[in-house]
Amino acid sequence: MTFMDFEKLRHGTELIKRGFARMQKGGVIMDVTTPEQARIAEEAGAVAVMALQAVPADIRKAGGVARMADPEIVQQIIETVTIPVMAKARIGHFVEAEILEALGVDMVDESEVLTPADPFYHIDKTQFTVPFVCGARNLGEALRRINEGAAMIRTKGEAGTGDVSQAVKHMKQIQGEIRALAGKTKEELIMVAREIEAPIELVVETAKMQRLPVVNFAAGGVATPADAALMMRLGADGVFVGSGIFKAENPEKMAKAVVEAVNNYDNPVKLAEISKGVGAGMKGISADMIPAQEALQERGW
């Protein structure tokens, strides 16, 4: 009987990386900063947790340079829960990503929520065995990240605001650009590839599939069960929730309600019941009130 290396099965080839990402479909991934929060997320039904130093709302409020979480905290979170643990690295900071991979995280988020480390390049994700998720506002950004090796895409939205409008905008933008590819000739697709600065092979594949070649989650401003259901109705494969859980009045109730909302996103009667008694959501800030130079979604290229 051949011995199976389960670490190699979990990580490694592009097929395996994308397979792991697809396993999270239909689920909720929650930002956590402590093992206690990770336990709450798991008990609420999250399919995975995202370990970071502070939730986006606090990162935005504190200012300064936002970096990878303390490896000791990441390790404690890994040891606390049985669901997959993801963690954020700065854009272009391949050493942070290497450290997270060495810690044994299940996925790395090359995230615009943290302060970008490289003004020229994103991480070459093909050089890693751990899968990556990256943010995107449009089809060009999404396909460039996939070309670099991303196994999952998420909308950027505007993290830490509690305002879902930018996540809606980015989801509709990507889907609209994909629909516009339908029926185009090879020559026309080549022109599109040039315009959006993406590889023609990925443009052709996307046109044929009429969706991104990898799973596409919603993120950035999801703060209520209704927000989560809205993003699923718009075609998201799943939902990331950052500040919306642990900045809510009752994090435990909000976490469970968001998971239930994603599971019942197309049933308004159930959504009404789910939304009762969860307490107030995070206070938040309108994304329109944020100056362009302070918008996290503008990070990355």
Curated annotation (Swiss-Prot):
Q: Which GO terms describe its biological process?
A: amino acid metabolic process; pyridoxal phosphate biosynthetic process; pyridoxine biosynthetic process
The Gene Ontology terms for molecular function here are: amine-lyase activity; pyridoxal 5'-phosphate synthase (glutamine hydrolysing) activity
Q: Which InterPro entries match?
A: Aldolase_TIM, PdxS/SNZ, PdxS/SNZ_N, RibuloseP-bd_barrel
Query: Pfam families per the record?
Result: SOR_SNZ
Query: Mind telling me which NCBIfam families this protein's record contains?
Result: PRK04180.1, pyridoxal 5'-phosphate synthase lyase subunit PdxS
Q: How does it assemble?
A: In the presence of PdxT, forms a dodecamer of heterodimers.
What name does this protein carry?
Pyridoxal 5'-phosphate synthase subunit PdxS
Instruction: State the organism named in the record.
Output: Methanosarcina acetivorans (strain ATCC 35395 / DSM 2834 / JCM 12185 / C2A)
**Gene of this entry:** pdxS
